[in-house]
Amino acid sequence: RVDYSLARLAHYTATDPVHFQNHILFTNYGFYMDEFVNFALDALKDTNSGYTSFVASGNHITTLENLVLTKTNKQPQMPTYHLTRADGSGITLVNIGVGPSNAKTATDHIAVMRPHAWLMLGHCAGLRNSQSLGDYVLAHAYLREDSVLDEDLPVWIPVPALAEIQITLEDAVAQITKLKGYALKKIMRTGTVASVDNRNWELREHTGPVQRLSQSRAIALDMESATIAANGFRFRVPYGTLLCVSDKPLHGELKLPGMASEFYRTQVTSHLKIGIKAMEALREMPLERLHSRKLRSFDETAFL
């Protein structure tokens, strides 16, 4: 099982598994990858950062002594960057692409390396009219309509929010946005995220989907977050989700080309910085606290 997953990771990411770090960020947009490169190069220049190298797909390694970025000509299915530290406590960013099948594939295989945490940084449809484009959604529950894990983890099994992750993400949002109190709550809502397996869900007759979304009290919808959280629960990997509202299809605000490019340009940097800030905070957390007891069964021996 382990050998198979390591071989799959090398295939999908075009990087050797040895480069994977203990803190994993998932996204599905190339914009985040580009911004991560900029952050990584700046981090390498900072001799106090603790980061030692930047590894891109194709196993191209950049260090402080050789700050020449080399990119592979042929991108793999899941482009992956690693900002490494000597003890493996750096950050890996994986572009999983779109859909729950990709999310399951990535997390199935990364789980064998027993990372200390993984977070989803993606975009979502805001379901409440009071939300604005660019607002953040911190998931504290999931409506699982992604289908891909139903046989491995039945949908009747709750996927709990992990306080250690939730508090860290909220603190990171506050630090990066420099907001607090009501101003912070206004741009970051906590609630249920629905994940579906139909990218064009909004084209269907709305009676069924809208009723289920309303009954679940969902505030956002995407295609990957519930899968990543459910597989984190399944494999005992601490998980979390921070999404950014990119459209509101139920309220007439669709993701159109011009609006999307403006949105991405203004939001990507701060969203990624929040994810990185959260991971750096989790790195300082004692492992016995980070690896929550919520991830263990009553008859399981606690282990890291």
Question: Where are the regions that the model predicts?
Answer:
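N-terminal short beta-loop-beta anion/metal-coordinating cradle
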Residues: 1-98
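Glycine-rich phosphate- or other oxyanion-binding loops that anchor nucleotides, phosphorylated ligands
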Residues: 63-304
